[in-house]
Each structure stands twice: as C-alpha cells, then as structure tokens.
C-alpha cells in the first residue's frame, strides 16, 4: 500500500466517531501505561476505564476543546475502500508565534494495517501540518515499555527531552 496515496483524512465528528476514538484511546492508554498497570489484563483495564465517566468525559472534553483551534489535527484515516484504518489527534499549544508547538496526543493504526508504514506516514503528516501552521516544535510521548512507538520516534528523528517517574505505593 502506498501510504501517501488513496488515503483519506476525515475530520472527527464526535457524534459519529466518539465510540471509535474512546475505544482506541483506551487501547493507547494501556499500551503506554506503566508496568504495574499493564499487569492487569486488558479486558479488566478496559472495564475499569469505561466504568469511570470522568475518564471518558475528560478525554472527550479535551479533544472537543482542542478542535476549536483550526490548527488541530483530529482525523480518522480511511483507505481507498472507506475502511477506517486509524486516527490521529494533534492539538497545538502556545499563542506566542515564537513558541508554538504541536503535540501528538494520539496516533493509532488498526492492527490489520500495521507494518505498512502508516504510523510513519501519520507522523510525517503531523510534522508537515505543524510546520505549515507555525509550530516550532512537535512533541510526542509514549510509555516506557512501548518499544514499537519508541522505535518509530527514533526513526523519525525525535529526541527524548524529559523523564517522568512514579513509585508504586504499598
């Protein structure tokens, strides 16, 4: 599959797409969560996440608020047959033209489409969009055990700029 041809970016419509992006958001969170949280089987993690309305509402509020900014990327990616193959959410931050940055909050490629260069395509797309819309920097985060995402970031020329720590309390 040529990743830059025959792909369609469709703006997220929360009435139509909220179930899809909530499911993928939960999968992304699990893949990027800390080691102790990932000891929980995914189905239990998912059940806990979806039982907390605050989690869902917080995420939907954040994406809704970010979409008020026309620079934000909030796209569902579809193939030439109209099948959903992933999604990308990249809000912008900063009002000072000398310090505007884009933040790759979520990038997701459906399992059946992985290994085809789509994640690289989406990251490249986000970078070009960010440059075109005045960002000086693009940021993206991942979990400490999400090796495939770390490799993608390294391949795309991203460098680590911060560490986060946690302590399991007993």
What are these regions (language model features)?
Residues 1-43:
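Conserved N-terminal entry element of GNAT/NAT acetyltransferase domains
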Residues 26-99, 105, 168:
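Acetyl-CoA-dependent GNAT
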Residues 154-163:
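Conserved acetyl-CoA-binding loop of GNAT-fold acetyltransferases
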Residues 130-141:
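Conserved GNAT acetyl-CoA-binding A-motif
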Residues 20, 24, 58-62, 121, ...:
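Alpha-helical elements of Rossmann-like donor-binding domains used by nucleotide-donor carbohydrate transfer enzymes
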Residues 114, 140-150, 166-168:
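Conserved beta-strand-loop-alpha-helix junction that forms the acyl-donor binding cleft
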Residues 106-109, 115-128, 132, 147, ...:
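Conserved acetyl-CoA-binding loop-helix of GNAT-fold acetyltransferases
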